[in-house]
């Protein structure tokens, strides 16, 4: 996940969320299409052929920036009466977490988000070797102090450590019923709250690494009725100490870390000053990640997922509002049309366009259009028709030239001319739609990037036209498709915006 974020931040790269495939059910099935697409949407195929066809049917794309990416963790809302697991560094197959039986920390229920979108890690849940599941949580943590604390006066035994608050802007973009979004720039953020938590978690400065010593076995026969006996935590770090209490039988009943120390990856409690027991105790210093709780948030919470956000609205003619789409993809480093240079602009149109005159009828989105040209017939599928500007947008994919009966490379009559993918021409030959009755002529006299059809308002067309024709802004098939998802067909309109949220797991 971190590597992906870094590559997006790298100015040498350009990532785009792309919408495509206006006609997933017709007029020709095969080539990734299906008559039952909307009721039984197929999964994308993992093949170069499938990806190439998806590239042919792209409509438009919007650039991904670091502002539109967040690391994610599984959402766990605090709920009264729920037992949560405490953070431990040693969950494994041999030592699964006691409530969820997780063999790794990141699957355990060791953090929560409260009603205010504050996120906390559980330092203590009142558990021990004789009560491994701990207590039910009764007090919702709401504090934002940087030191671990109990959340209320119920005596539930919980100690919580505040980590961060999801800001309102991230709630709007990245909120999900399944995931919590994590701040994007934790190691470098100068936001006061984040900086305070991060710096407090640096035990090389604060000598506060270890927060909890877990009583796995109480032992028996240590010095009786000890209160506040401070002993050392020894290991590969330095400076940690814990205060021990014992009962009338010499059992260890309580531990309280008085100095967290620094530099530990393991530790043992030195009980040599508490007498000679008949049964020895087992106390486990819980080792935080990195330098301490809150210092390296991504490591502490296991942020192995990302959410990529993009909003498509009607603010530009690159995103026509009358189109449909059934595929969503992320592509890396498409190249500018007619060039090998990486496309870097905020958005692109990946379809061809025709400025028409004398239209009759209204075309259907997704239907085939044709024009007689030199060498045969140009063909395409309509993506959009703007009645204000008289601009037809279309794409061309291999289904237009393959065998129309078998939907593949089977030989057919007329293959010599019909299998050629020909471009539409700026000529007097009409554009004719296959089913709707729509016809129109190419506006051969139109050149430019804007039009003023009523004489009162200049409308930007998004792409530059030459003699009535416009090319895509990226080279067909350029860029690497790193994510592809099929959806039931979605119809756009001028009153809606599409918020696309893509979850990537690493």
What kind of feature is each model-predicted range?
Residues 1-205, 280-282, 371, 376-380, ...:
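Tryptophan-rich substrate-binding surfaces of secreted polymer-degrading and adhesive proteins
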């Amino acid at each position: 996940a971190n590597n992906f974020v870094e590559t997006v931040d790298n100015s040498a790269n350009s990532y785009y969320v792309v919408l495509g495939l206006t006609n997933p059910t017709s007029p020709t099935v095969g080539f990734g299409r299906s008559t039952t697409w909307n009721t039984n949407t197929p999964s994308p195929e993992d093949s170069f052929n499938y990806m190439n066809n998806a590239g042919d049917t792209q409509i438009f794309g919007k650039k991904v920036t670091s502002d539109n990416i967040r690391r994610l963790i599984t959402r766990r809302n605090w709920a009264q009466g729920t037992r949560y697991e405490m953070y431990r560094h040693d969950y494994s197959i041999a030592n699964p977490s006691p409530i969820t039986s997780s063999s790794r920390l990141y699957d355990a229920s060791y953090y929560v988000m409260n009603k205010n979108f504050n996120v906390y890690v559980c330092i203590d849940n009142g558990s021990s070797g004789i009560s491994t599941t701990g207590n039910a949580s009764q007090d919702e943590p709401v504090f934002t102090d940087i030191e671990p604390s109990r959340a209320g006066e119920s005596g539930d035994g919980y100690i919580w450590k505040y980590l961060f608050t999801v800001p309102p802007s991230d709630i709007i973009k990245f909120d999900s019923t399944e995931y919590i979004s994590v701040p994007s720039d934790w190691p470098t953020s100068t936001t006061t709250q984040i900086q305070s938590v991060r710096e407090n978690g640096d035990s090389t400065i604060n000598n506060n690494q270890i927060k909890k010593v877990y009583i796995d076995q109480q032992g028996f026969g240590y010095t009786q009725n000890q209160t506040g006996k401070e002993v050392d935590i020894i290991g590969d770090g330095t400076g940690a100490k814990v205060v021990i209490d014992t009962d009338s039988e010499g059992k260890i009943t309580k531990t309280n870390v008085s100095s967290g120390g620094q530099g530990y990856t393991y530790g043992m409690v030195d009980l040599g000053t508490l007498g000679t027991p008949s049964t020895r105790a087992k106390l486990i210093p819980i080792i935080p990640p990195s330098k301490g709780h809150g210092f390296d948030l991504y490591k502490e919470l296991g942020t192995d997922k990302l959410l990529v956000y993009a909003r498509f609205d009607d603010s530009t003619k690159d995103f026509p509002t009358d189109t449909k789409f059934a595929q969503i993809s992320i592509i890396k480093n498409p190249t500018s049309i007619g060039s090998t240079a990486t496309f870097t602009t905020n958005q692109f149109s990946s379809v061809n366009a025709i400025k028409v005159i004398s239209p009759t009828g209204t075309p259907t989105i997704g239907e085939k259009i044709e024009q007689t040209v030199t060498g045969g017939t140009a063909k395409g599928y309509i993506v959009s028709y703007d009645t204000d500007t008289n601009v037809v947008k279309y794409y061309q994919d291999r289904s237009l030239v393959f065998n129309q009966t078998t939907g593949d490379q089977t030989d057919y009559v007329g293959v010599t001319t019909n299998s050629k993918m020909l471009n539409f021409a700026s000529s007097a030959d009409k554009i004719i739609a296959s089913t709707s009755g729509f016809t129109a002529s190419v506006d051969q006299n139109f050149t430019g990037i804007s039009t003023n059809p009523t004489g009162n308002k200049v409308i930007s067309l998004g792409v530059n036209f030459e003699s009535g024709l416009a090319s895509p802004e990226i080279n067909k098939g350029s860029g690497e498709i790193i994510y592809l998802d099929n959806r039931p067909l979605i119809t756009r309109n001028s009153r809606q915006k599409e918020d696309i949220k893509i979850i990537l797991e690493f």
